[in-house]
Amino acid sequence: MTKILAADDSVSIRQMVSHTLKDAGYDVETANDGSDALKKAQATKFDVVISDVNMPIMGGLELVKALRGNPQYKFTPILMLTTETSAEKKQQGKAAGATGWLVKPFNPDTLLKTLKRVI
């Protein structure tokens, strides 16, 4: 079963992502910020990481850079799920190593299609 780590500081977004993915048959663990996600990713190998960009303590772009610095996550798909729509932020995400970019509010079907594309 594909293991997914979803990081977002919004409880409602974490719940929506978790329910959407669990209903589709994925094993999902959530984190409330980038620091929490990084700790969980160091303890458990995930097949995919989904992260918000703007979070307290450690943001999503910092998380991507930290994960890409770990050989275990060098080729792991990392999707950003965010309200950020600027070309500059998307470029920063790509430069950090993000695999894809989804904008909130998101359509659950779009999330699932994007996930299937990167796995």
Where do the protein language model's features map onto the residues?
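C-terminal output helix
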Residues: 106-115
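Short, glycine/charged-rich "phosphate-handling" switch motifs in NTP-dependent
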Residues: 99
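Active-site residues of response regulator receiver
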Residues: 52, 82
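Charged docking surfaces used in two-component/phosphorelay signaling
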Residues: 15-23
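Receiver (REC) domain active-site loop signature in two-component systems and cognate sites
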Residues: 55
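Active-site beta3 strand of CheY-like receiver
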Residues: 45-50
